[in-house]
Amino acid sequence: MIWNDHSDLRGCHAFLSPSQSRWLRYDMEKLEQVYLNMQAKERGTKIHELASQLIEFGIGLPKNHKTLNMFVNDAIGYGMESERVLYYSANCFGTADAISYSEKFKRVRIHDLKSGLIPAKMDQLAVYAALFCLEYNKKPKDLEIIMRIYQFDDILEERPESDYIDEIIDQIVISDKTLNKIGGR
């Protein structure tokens, strides 16, 4: 047999992939919905990459009330790092869209850019705050923690109580120990 050459597709996955065959049970409306969601996710990834590069190079955007512009301009204005990995263990780590820490003011600022249609929750940012405390040996009660979500051309801001971050820290530590006992990383 002389096989057709598709070497350029190695490592790629088709939307109608045999290994992800649940699409066989979709009606055309569901197929369309899942496909559009996948495209939105890919668009969100590209927007995050663009935002990260703009922040890294200090290139601001026009000042207006557009989500991307506010996120990029605020991150640059607050001297934030883009796409910073926060690590506790192989079982628990994540990448903050933008983060900064001021030793002088004992302030950690965590910003998250959301491009999806589902309203975001602050839980993700609170976990980043907990990871920051664990990795850099900081106590939440000694910090001012500012968390912001940029979505729908708006900014949501919370300043969590230290007890809440302590609870997340405890949950991370306990969950990590449990996973390690049962053969996690």
Spans of features found by a protein language model:
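Accessory terminal regions of nucleic-acid processing enzymes
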Residues: 177-185
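Short, conserved secondary-structure transition motifs
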Residues: 149-157
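Short, well-ordered amphipathic alpha-helices
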Residues: 126-133
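A beta-hairpin/wing motif
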Residues: 145-146
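Short, solvent-exposed aromatic-acidic interface loops
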Residues: 114-116, 151-152
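Charged, glycine-rich intrinsically disordered N-terminal tails and low-complexity linkers that flank
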Residues: 1-50
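Catalytic cores of nuclease domains that cleave nucleic-acid phosphodiester backbones
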Residues: 33-109, 116-123, 135-142, 156-160, ...
